[in-house]
Amino acid sequence: MGRIVYVHGDFVPEEEARIGLFDRGFLFGDAVYEVTAVIAGRMIDNDLHLARLERSLGELGIALPLSRPDIEALQAELISRNRLTDGTVYLHVSRGEADRDFLYPETMAPKLVGFTQMKTLTGTKAQREGIAVDLTGDPRWHRRDIKTAMLLGQVMAKQAARARGFDDVWLVEAGLVTEGASSTAHVITADGRILTRAASKATLPGCTQRALARLCEAEGLRIEERAFSPEEAQHAAEAFQTSASSLVMPVVKIGGRMIGDGRPGPMTRRLQSLYLEAAGVPA
């Protein structure tokens, strides 16, 4: 037997999980999702993720399927039933089921699915040595602030980057980096400023980004929220990206150009340690 998953009110073996043919998440990508990191059995930044889930649902006019305490209990139950120590817990809320039509009945009831994934999140080779990211045009729609399940643009960009020998990809629009395909992009200038995009409809508001920003403020580190070009990124002193599944990930090559000496820099190392310490994990 595989994992225990949550589908529309029931905990069932993954082999028995069923999602309706006419679910709008399946037919239209009319759904939102969240992924929360789990380290040593504890959810990390989950309050930020659930707040973002509520915001995304509100932007699409989809009702929250359960109260926040009930969602937290659901997540904890998935972690417990699957004996998850390190990995992620995934939530997916679709608008619901109805016969296929672009217009939907206002009476639809949202559908909630949840599952866990085992994954080593700390001390990985990539976190020790850094990754190389490609640069490509941003193929996505213009409401990237909503964490929608429509991810084909990101899938295509990541697949193309891998085929070119890169580990990941940063997206570019109008001559400026928007974000990573599944992460928030950051660069560090020679004078120690941490640059990252300000919140807007062009980017997803990152939960790990927000948590890290709080830590930086407490430490007196300078964060400048502004857009930067691929060229500025390639000539930065350091670079990194953040996400729930990669935490603080050093970037040592951008679009084929080495960043610094090609190794994770001291500021990035400090940020990794700060984040893990705040999460209660030995650095």
Which positions does each model-derived feature cover?
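Conserved alpha/beta cores of soluble small-molecule-handling proteins
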Residues: 1-169, 174-176, 204, 214-283
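Secondary-structure junction motif
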Residues: 208-210
